[in-house]
Amino acid sequence: MRRVTLHCAARLVIAALWLLVEVCRAESGAQSLAERVIWAVNAGGDTHTDVHGIQFKKDPLEGKVGKASDYGVRLPILRSSPEDQILYQTERYNEDTFGYEVPIREEGDYILVMKYAEVYFAQSQQKVFDVRLNGHVVVKDLDIFDRVGHSTAHDEIVPFSIKRGKLSVHGEVSTFNGKLTVEFVKGYYDNPKICALYVMKGKLEDVPKLQPHPGLEKREEEEEEEEEGEGPEGEKKSASTSPKNPVRSGPRTPNPYATDNSSLMFPILVAFGVFIPTLFCLCRL
């Protein structure tokens, strides 16, 4: 009888400890950013692995569509880490609309990240174009210089989802056939271009944020102070003078200390709840 009791107690303890280990592994073994990226290209450039481990492939349009340019390699790119400036220094442009096709086989929530830097023009309204995603306009009148200035990194971030054979983006829905087409649309001002881009599974908060832009932050703070100091009439005036195209350089970095670890408490309590009575029974035997 004692042997049977000891055997059962040991099995209970092992089961509780296994449950604890599995939960801890699930919490700490979440996919890294690089593992969630399903497709990445360094437009107009060669392969590159960035500081987050994302592996950008060589431009598949080389020799097929548009022209590659490395004009920006002579310039330092603000807001980008030194290791990843090459992603903003090279680019592909075309005198007409062009784009890339991204195969997507699984349903879920995705993010398209497009990297830009204006390395040629020194004023706004010189290069303006749209970006389409499977026919949906997701970026309208993109003027890189107007957004961030010269030789400065800028990321356009577009969340979308694929569910039940439908693509949903910016409140619009269309049939999805397994290929995501990202198009850079020729406008009235110069040629459309792209420096680098990638598609990843996840949410907006999963996208790495660019380094701060002092000029933009100062302008945003001044606008906030004006809005706080004015009444209803001032609010109307502030709204009319606000920039037409807000800067989209990525979501705010999540606070790592705000993570809820309550999911770990249950298996720990279970383990102790099983271990202590078992130990007590063993001592009595």
Swiss-Prot record:
Transmembrane segment boundaries: 263-283
Gene Ontology molecular functions: carbohydrate binding
Glycosylation site list: N261
Main location: endoplasmic reticulum
Lumenal topological intervals: 27-262
Region span, Disordered: 209-258
Binding positions for a carbohydrate per the UniProt entry: Y71, Y93, Y120, F121, D190
Localization per record: Endoplasmic reticulum membrane
Leader sequence segment: 1-26
Function: Carbohydrate-binding protein with a strong ligand preference for Glc2-N-glycan. May play a role in the early steps of protein N-glycosylation.
Protein name: Malectin
Organism: Danio rerio
